[in-house]
A protein has these predicted regions:
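Hydrophobic alpha-helical positions that pack around
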Residues: 114, 118, 174-288, 294-301, ...
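Histidine-anchored nucleotide/phosphate-binding helix
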Residues: 154-170, 359-361
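Short hydrophobic beta/alpha edge segments that flank linear recognition/processing sites
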Residues: 26-40, 57-60
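Generic structural motif
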Residues: 10-14, 26-29, 43-52
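Cofactor-cradling patches in redox/metallo enzymes
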Residues: 149-152, 183, 372-463
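Acidic, low-complexity mobile loops and tails
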Residues: 1-18
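Redox- and metal-dependent alpha/beta enzyme cores, enriched for Fe-S-associated oxidoreductases
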Residues: 342-389
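Gly-rich Lys/Arg/Thr-decorated short loops/hinges at beta-loop-alpha junctions or inter-strand turns
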Residues: 92, 135-149, 378-384
Length: 467
């Protein structure tokens, strides 16, 4: 194993501060960094020696032999489940990385439902209230091509359910709902059996469209409530927990295990085929290149390597380390060459940032002459990431397409959700605009349908009797 690089910022909030120095021996589970503000503890994922402590990372030289044992976490009261979650350094494993101990520090039984915005909830009566409080488990595996969340259900459903029950206990929620895409038949059947005797836990089936895993989309699909871009799920008496995060919670409480590993999918232009290579319990800090080699190595010339998903991931390098939030490593085919043609960018809250889309346009040899935003993309404060008013449920984009045409664009690159891409296609091609989606090079690599015209119904019924 090559050197492990553990970044000091793997979560929402401020970077952690190292509490080790060069030359220190560490074990799997040794605490090596602590928060300086909002954040989560960071632990060594291997047995070894600290080589360097840099401004943004701790570099560890692993021992040749690695033991399975780890240093257990310790808290003053071993029965304090929330304290165990906090000490274990668990964050949202689905990508955002919000510290889970902070998220679960709420008493949902005493939480009042916030006033709903009538404009985005026109179908609900003004006096609508939720009778129950909820843990909503995000099992959507939102980014196309990734499969590690579904694999965890298939192989570790008991652990996941234990984690969900702990979440319910900690937050005093009286119900839990698994939000999972209807297409995952095997996982759904396994999950159904795992909760057969859990009267307060149910399953809600989602359509196979992006972004069903966005936090507010999970609330909307499961509870029928549209939250504003400023509201948290607590406004709907709920907490949304990623599936893998729930499993980490079970590990922290049952095994006193710190958060030192990550499940992820490696996929794309890989020797042996483009199928998903799922790796469970990978030590945090292992390099992208090492995981690609474990999957078979890169097959010839490629376009780029993405860390994360096709929509929200970023281009990365072989020596970059994985973190607690890394869900995917995608090796893509080469980009098409637009030969300097004029390009318009349609930036969406559900896809890449303007910076990421400009990077893609540059790699396609296109000249960006126009930039528009999806009409539902809201900037809550200057410089903050965009938020969609109704994730996955978008109106037309005719006005933006007309602007692109006015600005003499030949091509447009879009980063929109399934529904929004569909509305772009309703008018863009008729205006002579040639459309690329920012995920096209990934979708073509993994054999997934391109995001253009929506062919999947957005409505999916719940399983009979909530199960």
């Amino acid at each position: 194993m090559e050197n492990v690089q553990i970044l000091l910022r793997q979560h929402v909030g401020a970077p952690c501060a190292a509490i080790v120095k060069a030359g220190d021996e560490v074990k799997k589970g040794t605490k090596i960094a602590t928060p300086t503000g909002l954040g989560a503890n960071i632990f060594s994922s291997v047995y070894g020696v600290v080589e360097e402590v840099l401004e943004d990372r701790i570099v560890i030289r692993p021992d040749e032999e690695q033991k399975d044992e780890f240093v257990p976490i310790e808290v003053e009261d071993e029965n304090d489940k929330l304290a165990l979650v906090k000490e274990a350094g668990i964050v949202g494993m689905g990508g955002a990385g919000f510290p889970t101990g902070i998220k679960l520090g709420i008493n949902l039984a005493e939480t009042e439902m916030a006033e709903l915005d009538a404009e985005i909830n026109p179908e609900l009566p003004a006096d609508f209230k939720l009778e129950h409080s909820y843990i909503l488990i995000n099992a959507a595996e939102c980014e196309p091509g990734l499969e590690h969340n579904i694999r965890q259900i298939e192989e570790q459903s008991d652990k996941v359910v234990r984690g969900v029950k702990y979440c319910m206990e900690i937050t005093h929620a009286d119900k839990a709902i698994f939000a999972i895409k209807k297409k995952n038949n095997k996982a759904i059947e396994i999950l159904r059996k795992a909760i057969a005797n859990e009267a307060e836990i149910s399953i809600h089936l989602l359509p196979d469209i992006y972004p069903m895993g966005e936090e507010r989309a999970v609330v909307r699909e499961c509870l029928g409530v549209n939250l504003t871009t400023m509201q948290l799920p607590s406004a709907a008496r709920s907490v949304v927990v990623n599936l893998e995060t729930a499993a980490k919670i079970a590990e922290a409480i049952d095994e006193k295990k710190p958060c030192i590993t990550k499940n992820l999918t490696v996929r794309g232009k890989i020797n042996g085929g483009n199928q998903a290579h799922v790796f469970m319990d990978v030590p945090v800090g292992v390099s992208v290149g090492e995981l690609i080699e474990r999957a078979g190595g890169i097959d010839g010339v490629y376009g780029e390597i993405i860390m994360g998903g096709a929509f929200t991931g970023k281009a990365t390098e072989l020596d970059a380390p994985i973190t607690k939030t890394t869900g995917g490593i995608l090796v893509t085919i080469e980009f098409p060459d637009l030969h300097g043609a004029n390009v318009g960018l349609l930036v969406c809250a559900c896809g890449g940032s303007e910076e990421r889309m400009r990077e893609i346009a540059q790699k396609m040899n296109g000249k960006v002459v126009s930039v528009c935003r999806c009409k539902q993309a809201i900037e809550n404060k200057p410089g903050a990431p965009l938020k969609c008013l109704r994730p996955g449920n978008c109106p037309g984009q005719v006005k933006n397409n007309m602007q692109f045409k006015k600005d003499k664009c030949e091509y447009i690159i879009i980063g929109n959700c399934s529904d929004c891409s569909n509305t772009v296609m309703a008018s863009g091609p008729k205006m002579g605009l040639k459309v690329f989606h920012q995920t096209d090079h990934v979708m073509r690599t993994v054999g997934h349908g391109l995001y253009r015209t929506l062919r999947v119904s957005k409505q999916v019924d719940q399983l009979p009797n909530g199960k």
